Amino acid sequence: MSTVHEILCKLSLEGDHSTPPSAYGSVKAYTNFDAERDALNIETAIKTKGVDEVTIVNILTNRSNAQRQDIAFAYQRRTKKELASALKSALSGHLETVILGLLKTPAQYDASELKASMKGLGTDEDSLIEIICSRTNQELQEINRVYKEMYKTDLEKDIISDTSGDFRKLMVALAKGRRAEDGSVIDYELIDQDARDLYDAGVKRKGTDVPKWISIMTERSVPHLQKVFDRYKSYSPYDMLESIRKEVKGDLENAFLNLVQCIQNKPLYFADRLYDSMKGKGTRDKVLIRIMVSRSEVDMLKIRSEFKRKYGKSLYYYIQQDTKGDYQKALLYLCGGDD
């Protein structure tokens, strides 16, 4: 089996732009796919005394998201029951959370995680920030559409009623998904201007011109901002992350830090979040599950590579140490291998 390093080298040689994001996913479409057979096997597994969790995990973690939708359709046709409801009754705990997450489309999954982050008393700002800061324009536009479909209200409205101040402004601007797309022309003049404007609006003055930071960081393309943050160092004695820590506090600080880390290196950002979810006593399972489910078909190979490079041991190893049972098995399948 090729190591993740070999696969990434091969893909980068082929050129990033010609490579669909799924090429970096750990979960691929299953070759000999038969939705009817899978639906029958899952039905049998659910009916087995004590529930045959191993079969359920084996099937659903080794099929692409599109294939899982086909299985759910075939299951409903067979049994006149929804697969998600049947599995909700059959499973429990963290394993149930993983499996039900895998049955949703990526946009449905993100929409439901966002809704959960804003439901009831208090907001789970951490989850809100992670999803809104890390998704692409296309992903955010699809999330907005699906959110309205699922909850009969706008994502923006819910963000507005659940947040406040500059943090609200930043989240609303990002959630629109209207960032400039990657241009083929590099505008060095604008890079320099933006770097200087970020410095003038923050470290250089007393108080911070937050709207200026928001407009630059939510409107410019990712490759442009990567160059802006590099250029910024020639104006400021601090890099962008250090400047954020000096200039703003609370949820706004957290959001800007997450955003800049996502822009600089998204796979590393997720590797850090995964590490933080497992380090020390106890596991932050919600974060661990969300990243493993949502990135498994996007960039898990890159995340694994960054994780090993920074932390010296593989993501697979950490999951093995920190989880157990069929829940562990499901996460390891989504991880896709040891490095």
Curated annotation (Swiss-Prot):
The modification N-acetylserine is found at S2. There is a cross-link at K49 (Glycyl lysine isopeptide (Lys-Gly) (interchain with G-Cter in SUMO2)). There is a cross-link at K49 (Glycyl lysine isopeptide (Lys-Gly) (interchain with G-Cter in SUMO1)). Annexin repeats lie at residues 33-104, 105-176, 189-261, 265-336. Its main location: secreted. Keywords: Acetylation, Annexin, Basement membrane, Calcium, Calcium/phospholipid-binding, Extracellular matrix, Host-virus interaction, Isopeptide bond, Phosphoprotein, Repeat, RNA-binding, Secreted, Ubl conjugation. It is found in: Secreted, Extracellular space, Extracellular matrix, Basement membrane; Melanosome. GO terms for cellular component: adherens junction; AnxA2-p11 complex; azurophil granule lumen; basement membrane; basolateral plasma membrane; cell surface; collagen-containing extracellular matrix; cornified envelope. It holds the Pfam family Annexin. Changing V98L: Does not affect interaction with PCSK9. Phosphorylation of Tyr-24 enhances heat stress-induced translocation to the cell surface. ISGylated. SMART domains: ANX (SM00335). GO terms for molecular function: cadherin binding involved in cell-cell adhesion; calcium ion binding; calcium-dependent phospholipid binding; calcium-dependent protein binding; cytoskeletal protein binding; identical protein binding; phosphatidylinositol-4,5-bisphosphate binding; phosphatidylserine binding. Coiled coil: none annotated. The modification N6-acetyllysine is found at K49, K152, K227. InterPro entries: Annexin, Annexin_repeat, Annexin_repeat_CS, Annexin_sf, ANX2. It may cross-link plasma membrane phospholipids with actin and the cytoskeleton and be involved with exocytosis. Belongs to the annexin family. Calcium-regulated membrane-binding protein whose affinity for calcium is greatly enhanced by anionic phospholipids. It binds two calcium ions with high affinity. May be involved in heat-stress response. Inhibits PCSK9-enhanced LDLR degradation, probably reduces PCSK9 protein levels via a translational mechanism but also competes with LDLR for binding with PCSK9. Binds to endosomes damaged by phagocytosis of particulate wear debris and participates in endosomal membrane stabilization, thereby limiting NLRP3 inflammasome activation. A pair of annexin repeats may form one binding site for calcium and phospholipid. This is Annexin A2. It comes from Homo sapiens.
